Regions:
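His/Asp/Glu-rich mid-to-C-terminal helical/loop segments that flank catalytic regions of hydrolases
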Residues: 236-281
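Generic non-transmembrane alpha-helical segments
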Residues: 158-166, 218, 255-263
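Short acidic/polar active-site loop segments enriched in Thr and Asp
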Residues: 106-107, 206, 225
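Active-site rim beta-loop-alpha module in soluble metabolic enzymes
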Residues: 149-204
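Non-catalytic positions within long, well-ordered alpha-helices that form the structural scaffold/packing
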Residues: 101-102, 201, 220
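Flexible, glycine/charged-enriched surface loops at secondary-structure junctions
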Residues: 59-65, 167-174, 265-281
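Zn-dependent metallopeptidase/amidohydrolase metal-coordination segment
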Residues: 213-244
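Metabolite-binding pocket within alpha/beta catalytic cores that recognizes anionic/polar moieties
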Residues: 2-158
Length: 281
């Protein structure tokens, strides 16, 4: 079946499914899985992270594994949650977002790690990006370079409120998604690599990663809600690493799931508590 002009974007993705199944995600649409029953998706990069997130859910179930994609479902305080790994980078993230959208997922939150560029952001804290700079990637096939990669305000509000409630330090700001881990993030292999990092800092970019802009831009184009919460595992300005990687990732997971709970009950507005420490830069 080929996509037609009268179809919605989600229907067009489904038109490319094989025998009703996604081309890449290990999901059987005829059984319980991503969609109406589990419409909130958490998107870690690492497939091994899926089981760690699933451990926080009620009645978790691994749906399947295929290449970089591991998919699980469960519930969190009454909200149906899908967990789907994306692998590293934009192309595999594009696949995950489009196929989840075609299955009926309506809210997606990237959970993972990042490197901070601002010396004021400590390793082990969290970053909630309200927008990302697109530094090339698969979104270029869908929209011009001027099209923004912005998080949905309801998801940003839910994430910040969750971090406040849990008492976790976090920073809000604009990050950058790169298509290159080494040269593109200033880990110079060839001459000129250092210029990338200087450019990001000049623009006020607070962190670098490789998937979020693809998620945010595609979600906007598809009419979905999306957001980003990341653990800071290195501060590039200080060359200081996070000594508690797993504990930081657990904070990311807890914030994302509490945000899902808030979004699921329709109460995404940030509540003021005495817990978290926030900074906008």
């Amino acid at each position: 079946m080929q996509a037609s002009n009268w179809m919605t974007p989600r229907e067009r993705v489904r038109a490319y499914f094989r025998a009703g199944r996604p081309v890449h995600l290990p999901v059987d649409p005829t059984g319980p899985g991503p969609g109406e029953a589990f419409p909130f998706a958490l998107l870690p990069g690492d497939p091994e992270r899926v089981e760690r997130i699933a451990a926080h859910l009620e009645n978790p179930r691994i749906i399947g594994r295929n290449r970089e994609f591991t998919v699980a479902v469960g519930t969190y305080r009454g909200c149906g949650v899908t967990v789907c790994s994306t692998g590293i980078g934009g192309p595999s993230t594009e696949i995950a977002v489009l196929e989840l959208a075609a299955l009926g997922v309506h809210t997606l939150i990237r959970t993972g790690g990042t490197g901070a560029l601002d010396a004021r952001i400590p390793p082990g804290s969290l970053i909630i990006n309200h927008a990302m700079m697109r530094d090339s990637g698969p979104v270029d096939a869908y929209a011009p370079p001027t099209y923004p990669a912005a998080a949905h305000p309801e998801v940003v509000a839910a994430l910040t409120a969750a971090a406040e409630e849990l008492g976790f330090a976090y920073t809000c700001g604009i990050g950058a998604t790169t298509a290159s881990y080494y040269q593109g993030q200033g880990r110079a292999i060839l001459p000129g690599g250092d210029e990338h990092l200087a450019r990001f800092r000049h623009l006020g970019i607070i962190n670098l990663e490789m998937e979020a802009a693809t998620l945010l831009a595609l979600a906007s184009l598809l009419g979905l809600r999306a957001g980003v919460v990341l653990g800071v595992h290195i501060n590039r300005a200080l060359d200081r690493w996070d000594d508690a990687y797993e504990a930081t990732q657990d904070k990311v997971i807890r914030v994302a799931l509490e945000a899902v709970r808030r979004l699921g009950r329709g109460g995404a507005a940030a509540s003021k508590t005495a817990g978290g420490t926030s900074r906008r830069v």
